[in-house]
């Protein structure tokens, strides 16, 4: 069975890793002002965010993919794959994961996993799924392994300033 591994771009995996492990990212939307919608890693970068904050003193706003957008994303993947496993960043922090889950509930062979993590912790769960998919493991084996790995991850970070946190 050919399994696609999908995730939101906030997993912070490099393009090189995504290409090597066949990981399909959703570029998460964010706005730098009222009329400046961008997509993470596609039309906007971390550098853009820092420059915007320095220039305006304002933080960017983010939005979640809706169910329709996830359905479109999953259907596109199902054209080339037998199943899709989508990993989202913590469902407690964003509606993104809930929207992906609701979209998957109306589809066959689409599964969602709550990484219960952010950033690199989230990325580790995604990477483990991709490695196991390349090893030829089943959907059930990949999900079970991802949940075991997820429950062992603890992510910490230090910041130079609280300016970008809210």
What label would you give each PLM region?
Residues 62-72:
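Glycine-rich, highly charged phosphate/nucleotide-binding loops
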Residues 72-80:
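Short, well-structured alpha-helical segments in soluble
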Residues 83-90, 111-114, 128:
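Short glycine-rich or small-residue beta-strand-to-loop segments that form or flank ligand, phosphate
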Residues 113-125:
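Long, charge-dense
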Residues 122-134:
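Short, small-residue alpha-helix embedded
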Residues 4-64:
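N-terminal glycine-rich anion-binding loop in soluble enzyme alpha/beta folds
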Residues 89-107, 124-127:
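Short Gly/Thr/Asp-enriched flexible loops that form oxyanion-binding sites at enzyme active sites
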Residues 132-166:
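Internal, active-site/partner-interface "lid" segment
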């Amino acid at each position: 069975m050919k399994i696609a591994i999908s995730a939101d771009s906030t997993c912070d995996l490099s393009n090189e890793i995504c290409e090597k492990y066949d990981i399909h990212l959703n570029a998460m939307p964010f706005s730098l002002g009222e009329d400046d919608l961008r997509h993470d890693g596609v039309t906007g970068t971390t550098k853009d965010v820092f420059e915007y904050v320095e220039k305006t003193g304002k933080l960017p706003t983010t939005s979640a993919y809706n169910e329709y957008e996830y359905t479109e994303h999953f259907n596109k993947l199902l054209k080339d794959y037998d199943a899709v496993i989508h990993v989202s960043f913590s469902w407690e922090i964003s509606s993104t994961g809930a929207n992906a889950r609701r979209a998957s509930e109306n589809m066959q062979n689409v599964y969602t996993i709550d990484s219960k993590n952010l950033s690199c912790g989230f990325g580790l769960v995604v990477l483990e799924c991709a490695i196991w998919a390349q090893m030829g493991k089943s959907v059930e084996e990949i999900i079970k392994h991802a949940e075991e790995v997820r429950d062992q991850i603890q992510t910490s970070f230090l910041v130079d300033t609280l300016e970008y946190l809210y």
